[in-house]
Amino acid sequence: MERILIIDDDITFALMLKTWLSKKGFRTETAASVAAARTALAEGGFSLVLSDMRLPDEDGIALLQWMSGQHMEIPVIVMTSYAEIQNAVRCM
């Protein structure tokens, strides 16, 4: 069973996504900050990360850079309600 990390400080949205993915057969964990996400990712075992772009302690770009520095080759989908081309380019 695939394991997915959901990173979002909007707890309602994160729990909705967690519930939906769990019903589809995925194992999920949530983190509400980049710091909590780093701790979870360091434990390993994730096959996908779904991350909000703007988090309370750092942004999703900082997390992507940290993951790259740790040589983590986990697919990441960055989510945001701020539809700006600049954000999409920064994530690439």
Where is each model-derived feature located?
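Short amphipathic alpha-helix used as the core "switch/output" element in two-component signaling
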Residues: 39, 61-73, 90
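Acidic catalytic/metal-coordinating carboxylates
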Residues: 32-33, 59-62
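Acidic, metal-coordinating helix/loop segments flanking the phosphotransfer/catalytic sites
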Residues: 30-48
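Active-site residues of response regulator receiver
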Residues: 52, 80
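His-Asp phosphorelay/catalytic-motif detector in bacterial-type signaling
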Residues: 45-47, 70-75
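Two-component/phosphorelay signaling modules centered on CheY-like receiver
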Residues: 11-29
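Short, conserved "switch-loop" micro-motifs in signal-transduction and mechanochemical regulators
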Residues: 70, 82-83
